[in-house]
Amino acid sequence: MLKISPLSDLTKNEFEALFSSYYQELGCEDDIAHLINEYILPDLLAGLINIEILQDGDTYAGFVIYQTDDINNEWNFKEGWGDIRELYIIPSHRRQGLGKFLLYTAEMKLKESGVNKSYCLPSEESEKFFIACGYERTEGYNAELDSIVYEKHDLSNKCK
């Protein structure tokens, strides 16, 4: 059975393992424990970001990190927009619709909070996924992350 729930003390260790796998897959050499303990968890506790973790039976299979861009947040690229910051599904669970399920969950929670539009800064490998979910490539570019901006103007628009 699939279950998506907000990150909690009970799932912190599983999230750390998933995030570590995600960063290794991206080829990042950052200190993952430092990132989680000094940036991610404090931002979560301050209400600046949201994290949902996906469980498939006994397996923790992925997560999504998202936020509403706000002037009070250190990362405020598009004021008032939803930002799908990170989305990860473990390799053994890919191509089963779980990424779309996580993305749709984040979008609906953003919509419930009054956000009507979202964007993402996908890697080249994930661009097709976001396009299939209704995001459109823009002329926007984020130099810090070396990424093209993709936008979705209707969060009622489900993934294909």
Show the residue positions of the predicted features.
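Conserved GNAT acetyl-CoA-binding A-motif
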Residues: 103, 110-122
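Conserved acetyl-CoA-binding loop-helix of GNAT-fold acetyltransferases
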Residues: 89, 95-108, 132
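Active-site rim helix/loop that mediates acceptor-substrate recognition in acyltransferases
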Residues: 28-53
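Conserved active-site alpha-helix within GNAT-family acetyltransferase domains
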Residues: 112, 124-147
